């Protein structure tokens, strides 16, 4: 299982803890520590069938000042989130052919 998350957010840490309870092998992609591959990011967004801005935290000041009213493509969203990790609204879990956008920590259970 792969978890794309922000280790500085409590909800993301809780999601990771639940994921560790259901899988012994977690590929942690902490966007504060590693530069997530553009390919993995693109795959996750496409499998979620969401627009790139749908995974962004619209209450974030950076979003309000720089993105609001625009519709960034996947590549633009990738670079914005990599440079501003707090923009990622919620963790994303990937396992086999499934991808789940974890709005709540327990959403990660949907991946099983």
Please give the residue ranges for each predicted region.
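Thiol/selenol-based redox catalytic cores and closely related redox-interacting motifs
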Residues: 31-111
């Amino acid at each position: 299982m792969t978890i794309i998350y922000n280790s500085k957010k409590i909800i993301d840490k809780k999601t990771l803890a639940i994921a560790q309870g259901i899988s012994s092998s977690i590929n942690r992609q902490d966007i504060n520590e590693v530069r997530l591959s553009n390919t993995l990011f693109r795959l996750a967004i496409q499998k979620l069938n969401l627009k790139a801005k749908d995974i962004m935290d619209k209450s974030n000041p950076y979003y309000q000042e720089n993105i609001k009213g625009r519709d960034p493509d996947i590549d633009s969203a990738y670079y914005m989130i990599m440079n501003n990790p707090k923009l990622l609204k919620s963790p994303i879990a990937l396992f086999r052919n499934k991808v789940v956008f974890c709005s709540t920590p327990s959403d990660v259970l949907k991946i099983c």
